[in-house]
């Protein structure tokens, strides 16, 4: 199950159960590659190798099974559920409603912000005053109430009145099986952390990688900073830390060739958050597992220096315990 790099598609789609990466990471990456859409079945569907021309992909969908439709394109193969509803807010903005891509019909940048805000507020109905604040962040230089009315009308025309509902207060309605990347990532992180606690390393590995793949991409990157966006971005930054931590722990638990993945994830965690003490502990364990005990001890010294200089604290008990064990091995 070794993943050499997060961007290597073959490893991403071929080495995990359908219910995790297939539902989020594979779909996101597939959309990056020549607009291919990979529709996947329920969690318990068996894997079936299906080579995509020109890309070496291995997908895990049963091509002949309903409700899949096979479409041969010049750029590859399209496997799509006819009723698929998917919203991607991290990285490239994608909205697919019942198998139709509709984000190109959105009225403006504000239309994307409006839809994203309502999606993340589901199922709550949002008042117009709150929507004005979410879109324009206190900029009342123009008649924002009228502008919001026009924006809602155009967005409703793009997605349908059954999706964008309400008048005085507005809310988005998506099917029960709709997939929203942000929600899937946070749910996957919860599963990963739970699996780590229980020592279920394979389950933790796939869930953590799913969360990691989404949270590594910026939320609505083409939009100016807004207070609510800043809050969500910080939340997803924290989730990325958690996903990298859970992934490294899962790789350590699996052992073998996965140890290299643990080291890479721990290093990425420390690059993203140098004050994350668990990152130092995971990196020390990964290096020691690969026989690099001396380097692991150097990591401890680095942790001690960073924590002292930045926070004025010594390493905590967990990392100190790892250090003590390594000293015994090194001696």
Q: How would you name each of these model-derived features?
A:
Residues 95, 115, 131, 155, ...:
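Conserved RecA-like P-loop NTPase ATPase core
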Residues 125-133:
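Short acidic, hydrophobic short linear motifs in intrinsically disordered regions
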Residues 149:
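Conserved catalytic core of two-component sensor histidine kinases
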Residues 152, 156-160, 304:
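C-terminal flanking helix
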């Amino acid at each position: 199950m070794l993943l050499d790099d997060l961007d290597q598609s073959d490893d991403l789609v071929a080495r995990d159960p359908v219910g995790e990466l297939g539902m989020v990471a594979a779909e996101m990456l597939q959309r990056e590659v020549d607009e291919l859409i990979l529709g996947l079945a329920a969690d318990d569907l068996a894997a079936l190798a299906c080579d995509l021309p020109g890309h070496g992909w291995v997908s895990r969908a049963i091509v002949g099974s309903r409700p899949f439709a096979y479409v041969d394109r010049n750029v590859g193969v399209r496997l799509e559920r006819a009723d698929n509803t998917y919203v991607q807010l991290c990285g490239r903005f994608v909205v697919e409603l019942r198998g139709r891509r509709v984000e190109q019909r959105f009225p403006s940048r504000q239309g994307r912000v409006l839809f994203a805000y309502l999606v993340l507020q589901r199922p709550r109905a949002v008042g117009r005053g709150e929507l004005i604040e979410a879109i324009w962040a206190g900029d009342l230089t123009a008649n924002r109430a009228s502008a919001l009315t026009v924006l809602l009308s155009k967005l409703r025309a793009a997605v349908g009145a059954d999706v964008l509902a309400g008048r005085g207060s507005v809310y988005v309605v998506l099917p029960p099986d709709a997939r929203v990347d942000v929600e899937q990532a946070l749910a996957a992180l919860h599963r990963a952390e739970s699996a780590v606690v229980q020592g279920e390393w394979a389950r933790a590995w796939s869930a953590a990688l799913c969360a990691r793949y989404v949270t590594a991409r910026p939320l609505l990157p083409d939009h100016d900073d807004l207070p609510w966006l800043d809050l969500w971005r910080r939340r997803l930054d924290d989730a990325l830390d958690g996903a990298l931590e859970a992934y490294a722990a899962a790789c350590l638990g699996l052992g073998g060739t996965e140890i290299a993945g643990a080291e890479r994830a721990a290093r990425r965690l420390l690059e993203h958050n140098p004050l994350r003490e668990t990152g130092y502990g995971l990196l020390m364990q990964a290096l020691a597992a690969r026989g690099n005990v001396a380097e692991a001890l150097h990591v401890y010294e680095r942790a001690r220096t960073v924590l002292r200089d930045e926070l004025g604290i010594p390493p905590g008990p967990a990392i100190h315990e790892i250090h003590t064990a390594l000293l015994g091995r090194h001696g």
